[in-house]
Amino acid sequence: MTKPNADSLMKIGQLKKPYGIKGWLWVFSETEEREAIFSYSPWWMKTATGFKPLTVTQWRRQGTGIVAQFEQVPDRNVAETMNGVSIWIDKDSLPSTEEDEYYWSDLVGLSVINKQDECLGTVKELFETGAHPIMKVVPSQDSIDDEPRMIPWHKQTVDVVDLAAGRMVVDWERDF
């Protein structure tokens, strides 16, 4: 298997604690539908020495989560060392997005500018809350202050996303 280009990879999940004695692991999926993570391949795991292949041999729902067994994890002893390992795929294996639709990984790193043309910071991450996703915006060199912000990812809040320019415009006052 050819080594991946790290710049073309996107994180889609993470391995969690072992399940059972045969090397199975809990899998935390960052895909919109939890089981959709298994429709993408090949998987890559990020290690201290670079990206290595991670091959799913079987998976299943277990309670409210999902567990999987991997070719590279023969037993529980190895599984114990895998907790926290991130799962990556090549972005080229993803379907194209529609207009005004974005992969969260494409939004991370964008500058966030409000309607008053003030830089509020940079998108560090997005996370789901139930009602709607939230962008964690952290101060940047160009931001108006040193305040981190939690800004809803919502059509009433986000006016413009310009991936090419590396910025988004939001309807968000500096003192919200």
UniProtKB/Swiss-Prot annotation:
Q: Which SUPFAM superfamilies match?
A: PRC-barrel domain, Translation proteins
**A Pfam cross-reference name:** PRC_RimM
Superkingdom is Bacteria
- Is Oxidoreductase given among the entry's keywords? no
What InterPro entries does the record tag this protein with? PRC_barrel-like_sf, PRC_RimM, RimM, RimM_N, RimM_N_sf, Transl_B-barrel_sf
An example GO CC term for this entry is: cytoplasm
- List keywords of the entry alphabetically: Chaperone, Cytoplasm, Ribosome biogenesis, rRNA processing
Q: What positions does the domain PRC barrel occupy?
A: 99-176
Print the domain comment field.
The PRC barrel domain binds ribosomal protein uS19.
Q: Which NCBIfam families match?
A: 16S_RimM (TIGR02273)
Quaternary structure, per UniProt, is: Binds ribosomal protein uS19.
Q: What does this protein do?
A: An accessory protein needed during the final step in the assembly of 30S ribosomal subunit, possibly for assembly of the head region. Essential for efficient processing of 16S rRNA. May be needed both before and after RbfA during the maturation of 16S rRNA. It has affinity for free ribosomal 30S subunits but not for 70S ribosomes.
Under the heading PANTHER family, the entry gives: RIBOSOME MATURATION FACTOR RIMM
What family is this? Belongs to the RimM family.
What's the protein called, per UniProt? Ribosome maturation factor RimM
The organism of origin for this protein: Psychrobacter sp. (strain PRwf-1)
